[in-house]
């Protein structure tokens, strides 16, 4: 089936859209992909409803209609008729994730999107897992396993979006997955506050600074790091502690220290793997930050490479994953497992909407 995936990540950079030919078990063909950035007003609107606050209903409608325009423009640019696309996997945008309270909230109106684009839509991928007692995240490991078929294992696939998450894959295909801690969110928010740009471009700010090692050690005392995987965390969980620890730092030293926070959390996560990995493959925006990649390489014992080293598109991977998960959902296949979200049993998920 030709499936389309849409992802709006916690980094708030934009909408990733990708096409994938898949049966929900294997990947037959990668299709085109692109990212459409958010404007400042859209980013501010989304930030304003984080935590479920503010005018959620209006923001959700605007957010959904923006996705619809992204899809129409993307298909037109590729010369693809919407009638040839079997399903669209619509992640939405996470504004609240509190699995301990059995609550997770991804805004995005699946019925409205289906009506606007004329393609069946699957959305709300996380709620069933959370309702069953799982973490509702990460969701991408089953797609990682499909991609990694044929690669030497054990290996780790690290996604550095707003939050960091990792999938450990053994040579027999068994999985362990969890959120490592902060990804780019701390650094992005620091860069925005100190430079007016929502990202530390090429890690230049961090490269000019010095890491406060005492702050890194103190950061790792956050209670999240005492929890055993599978586990997941909200984008903003670490902000209060992080800001306290870098208070008074220069823009450069703060960026260097926040980069070190993320890398140290990943290094700590590696101790939870059943067996050491032979390599780390990094996807998400963090892989484009040379300072982040250097910090990871220093802290990890196996080689660290971007996913492009094995021919994958790191900018498209999460959107592709939601195309893959949408096909699995339509077929009633499992999306999550005890080893990936901590749910008591494998779970399917997603809500289906027809145009």
Curated annotation (Swiss-Prot):
Gene Ontology MF terms in the entry: ATP binding; kinase activity; phosphotransferase activity, alcohol group as acceptor
Disulfide bonds: none
Keyword Signal found: no
Entry binding sites for ATP: 9-16
Domain of life: Bacteria
Pathway entry: Amino-sugar metabolism; 1,6-anhydro-N-acetylmuramate degradation; Cell wall biogenesis; peptidoglycan recycling
InterPro entries: Anhydro_N_Ac-Mur_kinase (IPR005338), ATPase_NBD (IPR043129)
Catalytic activity annotation: 1,6-anhydro-N-acetyl-beta-muramate + ATP + H2O = N-acetyl-D-muramate 6-phosphate + ADP + H(+)
Keyword list, A-Z: ATP-binding, Carbohydrate metabolism, Kinase, Nucleotide-binding, Transferase
GO BP of this protein: 1,6-anhydro-N-acetyl-beta-muramic acid catabolic process; amino sugar metabolic process; peptidoglycan turnover
One Pfam family in the UniProt entry: AnmK
Enzyme Commission number: 2.7.1.170
NCBIfam families attached to this UniProt entry: PRK09585.1-5
PANTHER family xref list: ANHYDRO-N-ACETYLMURAMIC ACID KINASE
Protein purpose: Catalyzes the specific phosphorylation of 1,6-anhydro-N-acetylmuramic acid (anhMurNAc) with the simultaneous cleavage of the 1,6-anhydro ring, generating MurNAc-6-P. Is required for the utilization of anhMurNAc either imported from the medium or derived from its own cell wall murein, and thus plays a role in cell wall recycling.
Family: Belongs to the anhydro-N-acetylmuramic acid kinase family.
Protein name in UniProt: Anhydro-N-acetylmuramic acid kinase
